Amino acid sequence: MKYSVEHRRIWFKGEILDINDAKINIMAPTSQFGLNVFEGIPCYWNEEEKQLYAFRLDDHYERLMRSIKLIQIDCPYSKEDMKKAFIDVVRANEYDENLSVRQTVFVDGFGSWGSEGPADMFIAPVPKGRMSKEYNKKGLNCCITSWRRISDQNLSPRIKCGANYINSRAGQREALRNGYDTCIFLNEFGKVAEGPGSCFFMVKDGKLVTPLLTDAVLESITRDTIIKLAKSMNIEVVERTIDRTELYTCDEAFLCGSAMEITPVLSVDKYVIGNGENGSLTEKLHKEYLDAARGLIKEFKNWVTPIY
């Protein structure tokens, strides 16, 4: 049977249960110190095939296992365990719509910030409450935040953990207070890094340009997807260091991530990007992204995992 959002089924500590019945100890290290790592895994409904596809599921687990290793959590689950639990809980909800599925490995018990365990996991599917195409057409007015992106010298941005998002929150709150939609971070060297939960791309002279992975950015699966899609479309992709002022004079720009997909940047620090609208290349890439996520591109069919 299908469940309401308020009573959807989640996978929690080895069981599938009502989300309201999942309880975590308030003194657990995950509650007190943010000791957790996670993935936001998108699923897309293919209406023609009546099939729900998880997008790049194995790649998300590869990254999750890297985060677990770097944070040093003693996780009792293998990638195969995680994948089975993921499919089981999404099936249990009988979803026939687009989803974002939060899969989190956390440190439970009564330990401190130095504890490796006991560790456990929850998987919570969340229906996407908006039509991606309409949302992504609106675009974003951004600022360069005064906060610098965390670097590999303190807490690496390549780790997808709850604690890292405090840095993201600082930049996002500053942007909202000053009337912007979101922000773009510079790294410790004053070069362009990424958004608070998204990677940055710009279009300059017909080329798609994005910061290097060593410029303090997440090893983003969406970033990798866009690079591969662009190359398949014969678009030249350049990974390099980007100066702040290049943002103000680029032809197009967008932020991307599993949740926001590909969302155009209309302005940065009130400098209008291009003509202030969704750029043609950005729009083409977003369409290609959605087609790939729904299993419609033969070349990238291996990126999708059927749920039913």
Where are the predicted features?
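Short secondary-structure junctions
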Residues: 91-99, 235
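Short loop/turn motifs enriched for small/polar and acidic residues
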Residues: 104-108
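Residue-level recognition of the N-termini of beta-strands and the immediately preceding loop/turn
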Residues: 99-101, 140
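Helix-start/capping segments and mature chain N-termini
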Residues: 1-77, 81-88, 112-308
